[in-house]
Amino acid sequence: MGSAIFPPGSVIFLPGDYRRGVIVSIPVTTRVGVVAHKGILADCLGPDKFPTVIHNAKAYGDQVVETTMTDYCRFGLGPVRSEGYPGQLPPEAVLERARSALTRPWKLTHNCEHFVGWAHDVPATSPQLRQRLTKAALVSAAGAGLFAAGVVVFRRRSHR
């Protein structure tokens, strides 16, 4: 994918905290639009000389994987961003939890956001998923309302 500014596989970091265990994100395009794909910065250097990333991704066989930073950025539309370190677990424990989930299947209810929260032992939530579902519900409700209004108007006209 990529963009004119960030070709596929570009590894560009925004300023921030990039120690091991930190949550990182990169904007990617999905069927529902652009989302922030999140992962955990690991303690190993890949052959690309960047830290590896543990993430739960549909693009990698619908499972939790540990990839090079270059692979993590392969579908990115922009730079890597540090999302911080939300929990109290030490980095070793976060990485141990993350690696214990390798090959765990991706599910809508266990996506990349749920995964990074779980690894940090904080409530596993997905604000992006909640936002998408809320939008879908509103659009659906509005569509149903318009349909119902159209049916009512149609009936009025047919009785005249």
Where on the chain are the PLM-derived regions?
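Glycine-rich catalytic cores of cysteine/serine-nucleophile enzymes that process amide/ester linkages
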Residues: 7-84
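Short helix-to-loop capping/linker segments positioned immediately adjacent to catalytic or ligand/cofactor-binding
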Residues: 28-30, 102-107, 149
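Aromatic/basic micro-patches that form nucleic-acid/chromatin recognition or nuclease catalytic surfaces
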Residues: 76-103
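Active-site nucleophilic cysteine motif
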Residues: 106-123
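Juxtamembrane/start-of-transmembrane alpha-helix segments at the extracytoplasmic/lumenal side
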Residues: 126-140
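Short hydrophobic alpha-helical membrane-entry/anchor segments
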Residues: 132-136, 146-160
